UniProtKB/Swiss-Prot annotation:
Keyword Hydrolase listed: yes
Name the UniProt record assigns to this protein: 5'-nucleotidase SurE
Purpose of the protein: Nucleotidase that shows phosphatase activity on nucleoside 5'-monophosphates.
Organism: Neisseria meningitidis serogroup A / serotype 4A (strain DSM 15465 / Z2491)
Major localisation: cytoplasm
Pfam family, one: SurE
Cofactor descriptive note: Binds 1 divalent metal cation per subunit.
Binding site for a divalent metal cation: D8, D9, S39, N91
Gene Ontology cellular component list: cytoplasm
The UniProt record lists the keyword Metal-binding: yes
Primary gene name: surE
Reported cofactor(s): a divalent metal cation
Length: 248
């Protein structure tokens, strides 16, 4: 079995090293990741310039583009490697609730799913760097189960690992996406020349962390698995929309 691995934190991140190291115990691995941090780029493609693929000393490949670019290149340019599965991560920080719409980590998995492959995005609910041992232990548990009976059809799973000590992980729960309040979207400032500039502000506070949500269960110490879908059609609003537009 072949697994293509990517992320949005870049090929030098700790998370992708952990993911590649553990996955290599179960399958053949090829890493194709952005050359730098591309967090928050979602499913964007690089269309205004050509891309380059280079190989680092550790064997990882890197691209001067987005996570989505990396999936396309990883599946297109290697005659000796065609992926059966795509793993993305492990992201330094959670990707839960509305965050999944912006996440390059989730986007890499999404693109693979659109290409017909089973895909999984992994994130650690911590940005301090203190819980990589937890992430690695959780990954061993998750992948041992995954490869015992691998999915045969395309799936898209978003997995978040809690920020607790390894011995305090309480298990695995299937969870729905929670929600956030809108954050302070734009922060005005001045550059050293006195010119007006703007920063995109921090994310908002969690507004839905009820039991059964990814926020709630992960904060309670569980590894959360959320099955995602791509179809954005609001089927329950179809009839009402037809009435508004006076269609038959």
């Amino acid at each position: 079995m072949n697994v293509l691995i990517s992320n949005d934190d870049g090929y030098l991140s700790e998370g992708i090293a952990v993911l590649a190291r553990v996955t290599a115990e179960f399958a053949n691995v090829r890493v194709v990741a952005p050359e730098r941090d591309r967090s928050g780029v979602s499913n964007s493609l690089t269309l205004e310039r050509p891309l380059q693929l280079k190989q680092a000393q550790n064997g990882f490949y890197y691209v001067n583009g987005t996570p989505t670019d990396c999936i396309h290149i990883g599946q297109s340019v290697f005659s000796d490697f065609q992926a059966d599965f795509v793993f993305s991560g492990i992201n330094r920080g959670a990707n839960m609730g509305d965050d999944t719409l912006y996440s390059g980590t989730v986007a890499a998995a999404t693109e693979a799913y659109l290409m017909g492959m089973p895909a999984v995005a992994f994130s650690l609910n911590d940005a301090s760097g203190r819980y990589w041992a937890t992430a690695e232990q959780a990954l061993w548990t998750l992948l041992a189960h995954f490869f015992k009976n691998p999915p045969q059809s395309p799936i898209l799973w978003n997995i978040n690992i809690p920020a607790v000590a390894p011995e305090d992980v309480r298990g695995i729960k299937i969870a729905r996406l929670g929600r956030r309040h809108h954050g302070q979207n734009v922060i005005p400032a001045r550059n050293p020349r006195g010119e007006q500039i703007y920063w995109i502000g921090p994310v908002g506070e969690v507004s839905d962390r009820e039991e059964g949500t990814d926020f709630g269960e992960c904060e309670a110490g569980f590894i959360t698995v959320t099955p995602l879908q791509i179809d954005l059609t609001a089927y329950r609003d179809m009839a009402e929309t037809a009435v508004f537009w006076h269609t038959d």
